[in-house]
């Protein structure tokens, strides 16, 4: 039987807090905030990684009752790790991503969801892990 050190027992995990229901008004714009968190001991590359071989943090929304116009990512930190010669642009702990949506005047009234995928590459202080996607689902009411 092979026993791995505890640092490998639990890999990175990014969780997204359940978003509050958002009211969208037809013909206007709305802002939606998503809060995500990485487990302790891990970081994710920022949306602007400092090395071209690293995979950026991205939030992509599926077109639906509203269209994503702008995503504001968390302000990254520059941190040095043993596996890199230079500091890396990363996010750690809990962080927010804010998206501005345009709601068409023709959007159907009623309840629904805005759906998207948050893609990230997590690392610890020794190595980076394969990228993962987390589904994001925001309940909305269109008026």
Locations of the language-model features?
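Extracellular/lumen-exposed scaffold segments
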Residues: 7-143
